[in-house]
Each structure stands twice: as C-alpha cells, then as structure tokens.
Amino acid sequence: MSSSLLSVLKEKSRSLKIRNKPVKMTSQERMIVHRCRFVDFTPATITSLAFSHKSNINKLTPSDLRLAIGRSNGNIEIWNPRNNWFQEMVIEGGKDRSIEGLCWSNVNGESLRLFSIGGSTVVTEWDLATGLPLRNYDCNSGVIWSISINDSQDKLSVGCDNGTVVLIDISGGPGVLEHDTILMRQEARVLTLAWKKDDFVIGGCSDGRIRIWSAQKNDENMGRLLHTMKVDKAKKESTLVWSVIYLPRTDQIASGDSTGSIKFWDFQFATLNQSFKAHDADVLCLTTDTDNNYVFSAGVDRKIFQFSQNTNKSQKNNRWVNSSNRLLHGNDIRAICAYQSKGADFLVSGGVEKTLVINSLTSFSNGNYRKMPTVEPYSKNVLVNKEQRLVVSWSESTVKIWTMGTDSSTEQNYKLVCKLTLKDDQNISTCSLSPDGQVLVVGRPSTTKVFHLQPVGNKLKVTKLDNDLLLRTSTKLVKFIDNSKIVICSCEDDVFIVDLESEEDEKPQEVELLEVTSTKSSIKVPYINRINHLEVDQNIAVISRGCGVVDILDLKARISKPLARLNNFITAVHINTSRKSVVVITADNKIYEFNMNLNSEAENEDSESVLTQWSKNNTDNLPKEWKTLKENCVGIFSDIENSSRLWFWGATWISRIDFDVDFPINKRRKQKKRTHEGLTITDESNFMNDEEDDEDDDIDMEISENLNVLLNQGNKIKSTDVQRNEESSGHFFFTDKYKPLLFVDLISSNELAIIERNPLTFHSKQKAFIQPKLVF
C-alpha cells in the first residue's frame, strides 16, 4: 500500500478534535492530525542585539561570526548567519532577570567573550563553553543601564542610574574584570554609551543631554566631563536620549531621543549640525554601516528610517538626508545592529514583536527582507508521551502537562492535568518523561530534580523524589533508557547513567567519551566542540557536537566510538534501530544516514565509508522543496508501522521520506545559483576553519502530488489525502500548512500530534504604536 497524507481535523484556535472514524479507501492511507494549540508558550521580547565582529568590507566573513540576542526573560541566544541563519546555543536566564545590553570582546588569539547587563549593578561575563556565568562583576555604582566597549577591546564602559560611568579593564583575559576608573559624575541616568576610539566616552542621559568624557591615559583631563550638548525639550516631560553612536569618518555623533528626533553633532566643537523630526515616538536604537554613509534609526513607532549622506564632491559640507523608511515590525523596535563584509550585508532588528527581521543594509529601501519565525525550536521545550498520550511543555520555571483524549464526541478533547512551578530562580533547560509516563526529570544549569507522576482522578499527583546526586548535577540534556534509567549530559559535557531505582543511585556510571581535536574555530567559539544533541534507543546512544562530530555510545559497555565527522553544524539526530542506522541533518538541510555498527573500528574511516546506500544516492539529490527551505530541520522521528519512512520537521514545514526508495534524478541541471536573497553569508568562507565551501548543483526534481480535499460534514472534519501515482508512488510528502511549530511526533501508528502556536496569540499585552491609515 502506498503512502499518502493527511486527514486534517477542522482547525480551531483553542479546541482539539481527537479521533476520526476510520475510512476505507483503496490504495490510500489515512492519518489523523491533532493540531494542538493549547500549549501556551510565548517567546520573550528581544531587548538587545550584538554582532561578535566589527564590519570589514575588504575581508571575507570570519568563520566565527555570531549574533547574540538578549531577551526579556534573561535568555541569550547565539545565532550563526550561515545557511539562512540557525541557532547554535541558548544561555538560560532566570526568574525576574532580563538582558538589557550585550557586548562582545574579540581579541586575536583569544576566544570570544560575551558580556551582559540586566537591571542590576552587575556585569556578567558568560562561559560560552558551558552557558554558565564565568564572572559576575559588581561595579558598586547603582543599577547599570548601558554598556559599550572601546576600539581596542580591552575596556568596558557602563552607565548607571546614579549618573556614574564606570570603566572596567578586561585586558587580563577571560574571567578577568578589574576596576579602572570612574568618570566625573553627573545627576542624570546614563541611558546609552559609545566610544570614540579609546580616548573618549559619549553618553546619552535622562535629562536630555549628551555628555563627552575624556578616557585618555596619562592625560590631565582623564575622567573629566569635557562637553555637554542639549537636545530639544518636550512639552510635558523630560527628554530622554535613548541612543548615541559615533561616526568616525565625519567625526560626528548621531543621537536619538524621546521626541522622535535624530540629531547629528560635530564632535570637535560639540555643536549641532542637523536635526530631523523623523519618528512619531521615541527613538530607541541607532546603527550605521562600515563607511558611515548610512545611519539607521528605529523605535516605538515601528518604523526603521535610513539617513544617507550627500557625498557630492562639489559641495564642501556633506549633508544628511532622510532617504527612506520601512514599516516591517508589528510593535516597538528595541534593538538594531548591522554587519558588513565581502559576503555579508545585514541589518538586523527586533523588539516587542519577539521576532528577528533581517534586511539588506545597502539595499534597505527596496531590497529583500526576511522575518524569522516567532518560534525556532532548536532548543525544544515540548515532548509527547505515546503510552499515556501526554503533552509536556516547559517554560522558564514552569512545567505543564496535558492529556489528549481519544473520543471526538467532545468539543475540547484535551485537559491540563498538571502544572508544576519550581521555586528555584534558574530557567528550566530540559525535561524528559519516562516511557510509562510516571517519572519526570527536570534539568537546569545548576541542578536536576526528579518527580513521580501518579494519576488521581482527572489530575496527576506530583511527588518529588530525593536524589542527592542529581540535586548537585547540572543538566544540559537528559533521556530515558527505560522506565528507571536515565542518561544525562551535564553542562561540563560529562555523560553518565543513573538508575533511579537502584540503591546505589548516588554512584553514576560515567560513559567514556572520545576527545575532540581543537581547531581554530573551537578555540574562538568554545561551545563549538560541545555536545548539542543526545539521542537514546535502548542501550545505544548517539551524541553530536556543534563542530559536526557524531559519536555512538554503547551504554552497556559505557564506551564511545566515532561514527562521522561532518564539516557543518548538526541540527537534528535520530536513531533508527530497525535499519541499524543514524540519521543526521546539517544546517544546510542535507540528510545523512550512517550505518550503525558498534563492532567495527571506525577511527580511520571517513564519513563517506559509513554512509548507507540510500545516503550515497540521495544526500545530494534531495527534492527541490528541501533545497529551497529557509528554515532548518530541527526534528526527526520514524514511522511506527514502517521504520523506513522518516518524518522531518522545521519551524514552518513537515516532510516525510521513504528511505526504501531513491529519488528520481533529472539529468537536466541548472546553473549554479544562490537562493538566499542576500540575507545570509554568500562568500566562500566556511562554517569551520575558513575553508572553501563548494556549493552543490541545484537539481530539478518533479514530485507530483494530487491533493483531494474531502469534507466530512457529519464530524466536521476536513481531511487531505495524497493519491498514489506511478511516478512518485507516495514516497515523498511535504507541507508548509502548519506554522509555527513547537514540536511534532506520532502518538500512534495513525495519529500525528502537531504542537503549533497560533501567531495571533504572540501579540504582546503592550499595545503597538498606531500608524495613520493611508487614504487614496
């Protein structure tokens, strides 16, 4: 019988129909789809953005270029701009924490350093290898509102609410923050900071003034306030200078304030050159390009304005003009940043809308732009238990569990059976539920807790299980081997087995891991050699690392053996025990299937030698739907009835592939072309070690699908079936109907649970600025 899809339940934003009566159809397969929209996960507001490198249009994009995204729940996300952007790491926040400023330090020969501030007197340096704080430095000068780094990357300046600007020396290397000096104090909060080289600090303050301090070493004016410039006064309230940047080419300062004005100041004489009343509300952020030919501003009115400088050589005084603006956001824009190189041209913005918007910097007015999905589940916060038909979701410090019914006679056939709120400050990093649905493991960066779930009536009774070992163990990833044994990967990358029912549960069985060779990239980006995926099936486990290393673990013998070495970031891993293979997806959405043989020595074998025949035939021959994907694959699972049929899913799509069949090859080939629309890295630098990246030919594939829509009026269920045809034989399916997706998995052989979030529910309680309607 051929495969086809899907019998879709009638969509309701808050309700769920669970069961459809089986319909007998010749040469067709019926599958019930549960569109689960009851999971109330909402991502946090984007509060800050920072690129790890300075722009340089004369060089190729460095392999270690990263974007840090700070959110209002204290999380920091690290993104790689390659392969249409993908998330590499999440640093978990905590209760009542927020990231209000981010700053990178990039010094040759040293690893990247990341600093953050967030509503306290502390500057935090993060350990990028573990995701834990490396150093918390208290500046002892009030709550910090702003942070900036000098050109030499050896000093931080932080602005406080008591009017103090503190300079911190970071030249000692990772983890070393030392007090340098305190600049002359004034009364107003320092809302924003910028440097002119290493010699001057520029601050925007809450009294409507821009101040310039001297930071020159061995100068008699060191620490003194040199100049003060005042912006326009608001009628009813004091003006706030939210953002300032320095423009080296013209020796100017650009400022944005709460009146909606953008002003350009002469640095040398501290005088106003030009002023634009462009925005209808507060200007919250500014950025510029490499050559300072453009300045971009954004804020509460949701618009991004571009200011261009008139470079007419016949004019002595080059003037700034308001050249264009675009309305791309649905709410306040809190942060904006830019990066340029030979192969990169990014203008990135984000805010209350919670999603990232990527523009082309040089063709801003009429170029392409991309709005990322609001949810990108690289780090998943949902799981599905098949045996008990449970859906588990966790966010910040709360775990919620729903049960899904089997009777379609009720309008709302799901129920919240458990809500667990932890008292600890740290956000939950991962959870795992035993196959029988009775034991829940909750992991965080500092501790791990175990709970027993017992059905009592229509609820689940939660009982905490004591385990001193786990209480002092940090957990990054955790999976169940069976109903009592778990495999844990700690934040320090130790992998060990714990038997929860054993009397010796305080003695973990550590698995011996292979050493990973250090590379130029792993020295610069410490987490690149760390474990990012852990998959377990019976007594076999597979781990993958950010650098593309895949190892297979024998949990009985507690040893590991190499499986594959890929030159790309791995976004999803799956063990297929029936086929005795491991399926891996990389950031460029290539599917690799490796033979899984614990008895063979693979140290001297290359990745190609362990590829299955299917992978050799099809890895570079995937359908055009896969080749043009913008969102990465983040999940894989096998079909229950036929393990050769694998399901793949990303934030906005679902696909199924039959691994028993090869894709047809069209001999007609197109010329090489890029499909990234200029919004990702396009030069020849590579993900690892700056090696050249060979682009694959674009192969035409024609996978025909005949979709017949049947409407069952009696049950009010809309179903979609894919008819069998001789060419495709139903071996490939692809849909982008469901979005954005939090999680996808099978509940039974003919039931598919799609955990999606209605985009309308993402809107913040904070009302967006209302733009006047256009009247023609």
Curated annotation (Swiss-Prot):
Repeat region (WD), residues: 35-40, 132-169, 178-214, 230-266, 271-308, 417-452
Biological process terms in GO annotation: maturation of SSU-rRNA; maturation of SSU-rRNA from tricistronic rRNA transcript (SSU-rRNA, 5.8S rRNA, LSU-rRNA); positive regulation of transcription by RNA polymerase I
GO CC, any one term: 90S preribosome
Subcellular location as annotated: Nucleus, Nucleolus
InterPro entries for this protein: UTP4, WD40/YVTN_repeat-like_dom_sf, WD40_repeat_dom_sf, WD40_rpt
Keywords: Nucleus, Repeat, Ribonucleoprotein, Ribosome biogenesis, rRNA processing, Transcription, WD repeat
Metal-binding is among the record's keywords: no
Role of this protein: Involved in nucleolar processing of pre-18S ribosomal RNA. Required for optimal pre-ribosomal RNA transcription by RNA polymerase I together with a subset of U3 proteins required for transcription (t-UTPs).
Subunit structure and binding partners: Interacts with snoRNA U3. Interacts with MPP10. Component of the ribosomal small subunit (SSU) processome composed of at least 40 protein subunits and snoRNA U3. In the absence of snoRNA3, forms a complex with other t-UTPs. This complex can associate with pre-18S ribosomal RNAs.
Other noteworthy facts: Present with 5440 molecules/cell in log phase SD medium.
Protein name: U3 small nucleolar RNA-associated protein 4
